[in-house]
From Swiss-Prot:
Organism per entry: Xanthomonas axonopodis pv. citri (strain 306)
Subcellular location per the Swiss-Prot or TrEMBL entry: Cell inner membrane
InterPro entries: Mntp/YtaF, Put_MntP
Keywords: Cell inner membrane, Cell membrane, Ion transport, Manganese, Membrane, Transmembrane, Transmembrane helix, Transport
Coiled-coil regions listed in the entry: none
MF (Gene Ontology): manganese ion transmembrane transporter activity
Recorded family membership: Belongs to the MntP (TC 9.B.29) family.
Gene (name only): mntP
PANTHER family found in the cross-reference section: MANGANESE EFFLUX PUMP MNTP-RELATED
Record protein name field: Putative manganese efflux pump MntP
Length: 194
């Protein structure tokens, strides 16, 4: 997998967390940099660990599915990307409640970690698909963690100003990127380019 594809995956994996961070930032009256950095660190660490867990699970099953690995990567990335696009198109009632609330909130470590795990399930599934590809999972984990740290830190700070405007679009963009990366993996394998 090319370095460019790894960076794309890193940013795609961070878009759910970015959308959640915008929501967290919107819930705060005036988010401080320490709040944003703490959220970025928690989300980034969790998002870096989950693809490694998925990769380990995928490696355990690799010998059984190696003939179909490119299809598995394509289907997993495509399904996750499609799910993210569909989720980005929906506006839930909690979005309106969050936007209407003027009550300042501070988010504790447990709340941030719970949200971080919830937004990193897709990264675990991507890790499973990466187990079937020629990629160094340590590099992917670091890239995903750094991208998530950056995106969440920015998301918290942008949250108050941008709220619902960018949040859903970021999730849709991340989904589109996953669908494209999955399609490129399948194309490279079928065409002999990979």
């Amino acid at each position: 997998m090319s370095p460019f594809s790894i960076v794309l995956i890193g940013f795609a994996m961070s878009t759910d967390a970015f959308a959640a961070a915008i929501g967290k930032g919107a819930a705060m009256r005036k988010p401080q940099w320490r709040d944003a950095l703490r959220a970025g660190l928690i989300f980034g660490c969790i998002e870096a660990i989950t693809p490694v867990i998925g990769w380990l699970l995928g490696r355990a099953a690799a010998s059984y599915v190696s003939a179909y690995d490119h299809w598995i990567a394509f289907v997993l990335l495509g399904a996750l990307g499609t799910h993210m696009i569909v989720a980005g198109l929906r506006n839930g009632p909690e979005d309106a409640e969050d936007a209407a609330s003027d009550t300042p909130k501070r988010h504790g470590v447990l709340g941030l970690a719970t949200t971080g795990f919830a937004t990193s399930i897709d990264a675990m599934a991507v890790g499973v698909s990466l187990a079937f590809l020629d990629v160094h999972i340590g590099v992917v984990a670091v890239v995903v963690g750094l991208c998530t740290f950056s995106m969440v830190t920015a998301g918290v700070m942008l949250g108050r100003a941008l709220g619902n405007l960018i949040g859903k679009r970021a999730e849709m963009l991340g989904g589109l990127i996953l669908v494209i990366v999955g399609s490129v993996i399948l194309y490279e394998h079928l065409s002999g380019a990979g």
